[in-house]
Amino acid sequence: MPEEMDKPLISLHLVDSDSSLAKVPDEAPKVGILGSGDFARSLATRLVGSGFKVVVGSRNPKRTARLFPSAAQVTFQEEAVSSPEVIFVAVFREHYSSLCSLSDQLAGKILVDVSNPTEQEHLQHRESNAEYLASLFPTCTVVKAFNVISAWTLQAGPRDGNRQVPICGDQPEAKRAVSEMALAMGFMPVDMGSLASAWEVEAMPLRLLPAWKVPTLLALGLFVCFYAYNFVRDVLQPYVQESQNKFFKLPVSVVNTTLPCVAYVLLSLVYLPGVLAAALQLRRGTKYQRFPDWLDHWLQHRKQIGLLSFFCAALHALYSFCLPLRRAHRYDLVNLAVKQVLANKSHLWVEEEVWRMEIYLSLGVLALGTLSLLAVTSLPSIANSLNWREFSFVQSSLGFVALVLSTLHTLTYGWTRAFEESRYKFYLPPTFTLTLLVPCVVILAKALFLLPCISRRLARIRRGWERESTIKFTLPTDHALAEKTSHV
């Protein structure tokens, strides 16, 4: 284990062979680093490659010197803090007290705290690591920075990872110096204010997909509900009433029946809050009143809900491709062939069923293709290359087309099954009839908002008109242009 811990995170061969990480001249700006861990090694490598002269302070420089790039000077901590004006403190919070013996040499210098607490420590301590470091060294200027950047991102530089570096501190000159260093290293500094903001900055790396929690719980809840419903209809009912064991359907067949239901409902929930927001604006007669908190949060989570809808739809397509590979499907084909022979039927063809299958498969492929476009354009690299009109056209117009195609796909799949008594197992309606409720409401509401008497009023409200205002307001001549200026 000790031998494995001594292995460098960054290959020295790569460091010495990379021309961008060559030795820097003596007149280069000097930067100090206290610490010899993985982050300190990556930081030293990036600083050397950015043209800085790096001095690393270690308690055992002989053992750790070979782990750093050859251009970095590794020495004792007392010598490392003597000349640099900016010193990175790359040690954990519990080791801050071991640096108190250097307080005289550190007086007047800029200390850059790059540490991160654990989730338990973050909740336990009232003050941030940076504020605690500032209390131990009152004669120094402490700046919080680079704590959201991983060792790998530092190693890769601006070619990979998130380039934004939140920076906070009480001295503008110190923040400016650290910001210039971040720019020289290929990152984008973001001023987060005073050192009191360090607690919030340190919480950033601890967050685990905060915007995805509610949509994920929603998708899981829908999946569990529809899965239980399909289990009762497709597995439990034949077992209870017909003594047929169909529990083999649970891993694939029931899952494949559940996934499109979840995807369809999630897609409708992407556009339902926009309908509710438009109805609320029409009722209030103004756009200057805030939406309720629940609606505001719903609107902010539409992207995540839409991506989960696409994920479920893609899984449904994959599961559908796997259906013919099942052994149960092969047995069904053999049994059907035997029944056809026993019935002395040489030709089995139902024109209505053939057309229904062809149509609903085609509509399903079109819906999935449209959803794929929505998913691709939601990527930041693609979304940033589109102007507002292009982005709103894809996400709003094409998204609504995807919802309509999904509705037609569901209707052609169901066909006349909703009116057949045999489909109501345990007096429960077919699953697809339950999924149609919310999407049909959204489609009908969207169609209602397209009526001229409503669309013109909504367009005026979104351009600043208020029902209670006495100021006269007229739409521009190009009404179509006015409608495209705002989308909810």
From Swiss-Prot:
InterPro entries: Fe3_Rdtase_TM_dom (IPR013130), NAD(P)-bd_dom_sf (IPR036291), P5C_Rdtase_cat_N (IPR028939), STEAP_metalloreductase (IPR051267). It catalyses: 2 Fe(2+) + NADP(+) + H(+) = 2 Fe(3+) + NADPH; 2 Cu(+) + NADP(+) + H(+) = 2 Cu(2+) + NADPH. Residues 1-207, 280-304, 380-390, 455-488 are cytoplasmic. Heme b binds at residues 316, 409. One of its GO terms (biological process) is copper ion import. FAD binds at residues 152, 160, 281, 302-303, 378, 395. It is linked to Anemia, hypochromic microcytic, with iron overload 2: A hematologic disease characterized by abnormal hemoglobin content in the erythrocytes which are reduced in size, severe anemia, erythropoietic hyperplasia of bone marrow, massive hepatic iron deposition, and hepatosplenomegaly. Belongs to the STEAP family. Homodimer. Interacts with BNIP3L, MYT1, RHBDL4/RHBDD1 and TCTP. This is Metalloreductase STEAP3. It comes from Homo sapiens. The lineage of its organism: Eukaryota, Metazoa, Chordata, Craniata, Vertebrata.
